[in-house]
A protein has these predicted regions:
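Sec-dependent signal peptide recognition
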Residues: 2-9
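Beta-strand-rich interaction/scaffold domains
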Residues: 104-167
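Extracellular/periplasmic catalytic domains that process cell-envelope and extracellular macromolecules
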Residues: 69-70, 91, 147-149, 166-170, ...
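A short beta-strand-loop element at or near the start of a globular domain
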Residues: 45-103
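C-terminal motif of bacterial Sec signal peptides marking the signal peptidase cleavage site
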Residues: 14-17
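Proprotein-processing/basic-patch segments
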Residues: 22-32, 163-212
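Beta-strand elements of well-folded, non-transmembrane domains
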Residues: 80-82, 99-103, 119-121, 160, ...
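N-terminal leader/pro-regions and domain N-caps
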Residues: 19-65
Length: 212
C-alpha cells in the first residue's frame, strides 16, 4: 500500500533497531519510477515487428493479448543515485515493487508474470530490449496476477533483484515485466504509470528499499 505523502518521489525514513545500543540503523527509501524512461514494447503476432511506446505514457502493458496474441513487455526505471536513493555501498535488507493494476485480460484465470532485472544506458527503450537474448536478464523472479488484483496494488518482493543491482553497482533499478512464457493461457495487464502530480504518490510504480 502506498502512503499519501506529498514528497513521495524521494522519501526516506530511518528506522533504528531496538535490539541493542550498537545496532546498525536501517533506512527505508521510497522511489517512484521515472515516467520519462518507462514504457513498453509490443511484438506484433502477425508481422513480427516491434512497437516501442515510451516517455510519459500514463500506463504500460505486460503480457500477451488474448485476442490478437500480440506480446507486450513493460519497462520501469527507478533512479538509485542522489538524495533519497540507495548508496552503492549499502547492504539490502529488503525491497518491494508496488504496481497498480488498471486492467486484466481475460477476466478469468491467473496470469503468471516474470520480472527481469535489466541494465542499459542511456535508459532509452529500443526494440531489441524486448529480446531476452539480446537484452539478457541479470536476475529474474516470477509472481502471479489474480483476478482479484484488478483495480488494486500488487506488491512484489524484489529483494533478490535489488541485491543483484547493488552487486553490479547499477545507477538505476531497471526491470522488464512480461508474462512467464510456457504452456499458459495468454493474458495481459495494464500497469498505471500516471504523470499527474496529484496521482503519482498513489498510483505510479513504487520501489521501496530497506538498506543499512
Amino acid at each position: 500500500m502506498k502512503f499519501p505523502i506529498a514528497v513521495m518521489l524521494i522519501a526516506s525514513l530511518t528506522l533504528v533497531s531496538c535490539s541493542g545500543g550498537g545496532s546498525t540503523p536501517t533506512i527505508v527509501t521510497r522511489i517512484l519510477s521515472d515516467p520519462v524512461y518507462d514504457g513498453d514494447i509490443g511484438l506484433d503476432f502477425v508481422s513480427g515487428t516491434f512497437t516501442v511506446t515510451k516517455n510519459n505514457t500514463q500506463f504500460v502493458f505486460a503480457g500477451i493479448d488474448p485476442v490478437t496474441l500480440d506480446e507486450y513487455r513493460a519497462f520501469l526505471d527507478f533512479p538509485l543515485g542522489g538524495p533519497g536513493g540507495v548508496p552503492l555501498n549499502a547492504g539490502i535488507a529488503s525491497a518491494t515493487l508496488d504496481i497498480f493494476i488498471n486492467d486484466i485480460q481475460p477476466p478469468i484465470g491467473t496470469i503468471p508474470m516474470r520480472i527481469d532485472l535489466v541494465y542499459f544506458q542511456p535508459p532509452n527503450l529500443i526494440g531489441t530490449d524486448f529480446d531476452r537474448t539480446l537484452q539478457p536478464a541479470l536476475a529474474s523472479i516470477t509472481f502471479p496476477i489474480f483476478q482479484s488484483d484488478f483495480g488494486r496494488h500488487v506488491v512484489v518482493n524484489v529483494t533478490s533483484l535489488m541485491r543483484e543491482a547493488q552487486r553490479w553497482g547499477l545507477p538505476d533499478f531497471q526491470v522488464r515485466i512480461m508474462e512467464d512464457l510456457g504452456p499458459v493461457v495468454p493474458g495481459i495487464i495494464e500497469i498505471d504509470d500516471t504523470t499527474i502530480a496529484a496521482d503519482r504518490p498513489f498510483f505510479a510504480p513504487l520501489l521501496e528499499v530497506a538498506y543499512y
